[in-house]
A protein has these predicted regions:
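Sec-exported extracytoplasmic/periplasmic mature domains
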Residues: 20-29, 52-56, 65, 72-76, ...
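Short beta-strand->loop
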Residues: 7-9, 100-102, 119-146, 160-164, ...
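Extracellular/periplasmic juxtamembrane helices and adjacent flexible linkers that interface
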Residues: 227-307
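N-terminal segment of the mature folded domain
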Residues: 1-128, 267, 271, 305
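Short helix-loop capping/hinge motifs at secondary-structure junctions, enriched
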Residues: 103-109, 128, 141-149, 226-234
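Periplasmic-binding protein-like
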Residues: 90-95, 157-161, 167-169, 200-233, ...
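Ligand-binding pocket segment of bilobal, Venus flytrap-like solute-binding proteins
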Residues: 145-211
């Protein structure tokens, strides 16, 4: 049996559980070899750091390109990884939405409602969670749409984050805080987490699609050094390639992620609000720049959160 390890971010557990079974069956049928995939999940930034520190991942499927770039800087992932797989190595996308309790008691309709007095917001910590970085940028995109003055944008972000009562280390922890522990009035969430919550707890929650959000592009890569050492390069490549097949893209849609295959995305037209205006990471100058400006030590997040 060939074993490979996929180090992934927080809310992808259920998707990869199903996908791994699908891939293992396909591999057995096509190559007549047994393969077993081991999963690891947590906040994307923490997961990237664990690979840098020696966690033996063959592949990484993380929340944002920046997390894989961190691993690339150590030489574990080959330069140019982003061109190795289609669509800039992003086999699925998502966006950021607001999840509220049934009946929307606090009347939350858009990002500015999250800055009102008495609104309790739940969102994870961008220092450890990739989803939290997308959450921050989605809100900042709204602020940029409203004001060109950076001080006004910062003031808006400061008011929003002043209302955050619990900041978990990962997106799944934030969902647990909101759903299981009943804390907060609104959860800033991955669209796929919000959809999954709606399916599991029918009738208890509502999704609010804000006027502006962000195209979240989780990235995938082979951890080349580890895969070479483990003799798993070929399986690792096929594992990530298989994400782009019609069969896998359909599973992606069923799991609440947006398939990058346009035809398959259309099949799920009712699941997703495709009318939300989506900023992209390029509107923020790409990840390197966005990370420096917003999430590095003493950058914008620290400035507005620790004031």
């Amino acid at each position: 049996v060939i074993t490979i390890t996929n180090v992934s971010y927080d809310p992808t557990r259920e998707f990869y559980e199903s996908y791994n079974t699908m891939f293992e069956e396909y591999y057995k049928k096509t190559y007549n070899k047994e393969v077993q995939v081991i999963q690891s999940h947590g906040g994307s930034g923490s997961q990237a750091r664990s690979v840098v520190e020696g966690c033996n991942a063959d592949v990484v499927t993380l929340a944002l390109e920046h997390d894989i770039s961190l691993i690339e800087k150590t030489g574990l992932v080959d330069a140019g990884w982003i061109k190795e797989f289609p669509k800039s190595s992003a086999p699925y996308t998502s966006t950021i939405v607001l999840l509220v309790r049934k009946g929307n008691p606090k009347q939350i309709h858009d990002w500015d409602d999250l800055t009102r007095k008495g609104v309790d917001v739940i969102t994870p910590d961008p220092k450890s969670s990739g989803g939290a970085c997308w959450n921050f940028l989605a809100a900042l995109g709204y602020a940029k749409t409203k004001w060109s003055d950076e001080n006004k944008q910062k003031e808006f972000m400061r008011r929003l984050y002043h209302n955050v009562s619990v900041m978990d280390s990962g997106a799944r922890g934030a969902t647990t805080t909101f759903v299981e522990n009943g804390k907060g009035d609104v959860l800033i969430a991955w669209e796929n987490e919000a959809i999954a919550t709606m399916k599991s707890y029918g009738g208890k929650y509502e999704i609010v699609n804000p006027s502006v959000s962000i195209l979240a592009q989780p990235s995938v890569a082979i951890v080349d050094d580890n895969a070479k050492a483990n003799g798993s390069e070929e399986v690792s490549k096929r594992y990530l390639d298989f994400l782009y097949t019609k069969q896998a893209q359909r599973l992606i849609g069923k799991s609440g992620y947006r398939p990058t295959d346009k035809e398959i995305l259309q099949e799920f037209g009712n699941e997703f609000d495709l009318s939300i205006k989506l900023w992209t990471i390029d509107d923020f100058g790409g990840w390197e720049k966005a990370y420096q400006k917003c999430f590095d030590d003493d950058a914008m997040f620290d400035e507005i959160y620790n004031y």
